[in-house]
């Protein structure tokens, strides 16, 4: 068994700036025997088109492996695109306090409130008489600091790390029912057949 690299490019539609495309990269595991079958078919039929090779009917096991690999690659590429879009457009409805507490405990977010940086003496006198408003102000300042920290933290994540973070801690909810993809022969195998 060996891993063969596969790639894809999908157009998700149009935006005001042109076509929105996503690229996927993955790998499919095939045995030497399966690779030999593909090489032989490509040479015999002088084609690399999966439909023309009729893999689905005559070699369903190979077709299934390729189909699953290309589908998963396309799904992953489209999924992470929409997750990032959802994050940047504020579409996730998560518990702000819960996320802030998690990030303080597990990820290093810390907040130290220094009244002199935010309030002058008159403000502080006012808040002495209204401690509840003072606590509200501190909370608002902390939330603002947290969102700045969160933006920096998330922008430093890889796609896989971001995917996990969005689902596990920001209540991302995404259902992709209709992922478009094509099943192809890995380029390395095509090159082998053309030698």
Model regions and ranges:
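A short beta-strand micro-motif
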Residues: 2-9
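Short acidic DE-rich linear segments
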Residues: 191-195
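Acidic, low-complexity, intrinsically disordered interaction modules
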Residues: 12-185
